[in-house]
Amino acid sequence: MVIVGPSGCAKSTTLRMLAGLETISGGEVRIGEKIVNNLAPKERGIAMVFQNYALYPHMTVRENLAFGLKLSKMPKDQIEAQVNEAAKILELDELLDRLPRQLSGGQAQRVAVGRAIVKKPDVFLFDEPLSNLDAKLRASMRIRISDLHKQLKKSGKPATTVYVTHDQTEAMTMGDRICVMKLGHIMQVDTPDNLYHKPKNMFVAGFIGAPEMNIRATKLVDQQGRLALSIGNETMPLSETLHDKVIGHQAQDTFYGIRPEFVSVSDEPFAEGSCSGELVRVENMGHEFFMYLKVSDYELTARIPSDEAKPMIDKGLHRKVYFKFDMNKCHIFDAKTELNISI
């Protein structure tokens, strides 16, 4: 389970409540079938990895891994076995006799994860553990932590993992299920696929995905029995499926939502459902371009493969182009509740 959201949404506070580091104001905290409200952190069967991993500088990697087990008075042979097992999983075998100052950032973070593994907890709690690493190391560690979770499952000693991050890439690539939070409230708990394709509200729709979803105010207008989106001074008819989902909402203020990859752009009008805008700027991502169109009083982002975009871009900016939406991928949100009324 990954908890994701912007800074200040209470995701780390939620994790600390699970760990027993933060007092809850009401309700129950359960780990498995056990209510743990009144249990100290060490009695909850959890292991936590923080953003600042704080290894003991005067101890070797081996000693850092073993320290918590020694405090619990575990037999020496068992400590050695569990340290060696964790070192093997995280590929730390060659580093066991090094001091923290002799480690790279990624290696030090693996040791911090190893200290959690050796405890063999019921629950792993990760609080933004990769925030201090550069982009390349973050990608590598994401894979390692995901692989660790799978290995523990296969070993017959599975542990629930709760992972907190503000990075949606980490959330989408690591989570079996993701909890999206805003200002202390849960906005949606779902699979990565459902969060992306079936967001329950405008916040989730705009938070998940990069570049973010185009979400703009619109009116649903009736055109000879078929509803259409009002876009500037033009309209774009809904698909039959979308029409059936939102029929009856014509009188409401609404927003449409469309991801940039479901916006098509052309120099010529499309056969059906075409609107126009001004091509104002582009961003070259190598294999694709982000094309920004000025439509009425806002910008619309389109994500277009390079071979399609290049001929249009070569004709220059600040000129009229045409666009249409894949209406089977379009969302309609109620302006008052911000809920998705099209799923």
Language-model segments: which ranges?
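The feature captures the beta-strand-to-loop junction immediately N-terminal to the Walker
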Residues: 4-6
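ABC ATPase nucleotide-binding domain helices that frame the ATP-binding cleft
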Residues: 12-15, 111
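Helix-to-loop junction immediately C-terminal to a conserved catalytic motif
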Residues: 19
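Conserved coupling/switch loops of ABC nucleotide-binding domains, chiefly the family-specific signature
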Residues: 25-28, 78, 183, 330
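Conserved ABC transporter NBD signature motif
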Residues: 27-35
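ABC ATPase nucleotide-binding domains
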Residues: 44-45, 55-203
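Non-catalytic connector elements of ABC transporters
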Residues: 213, 223-343
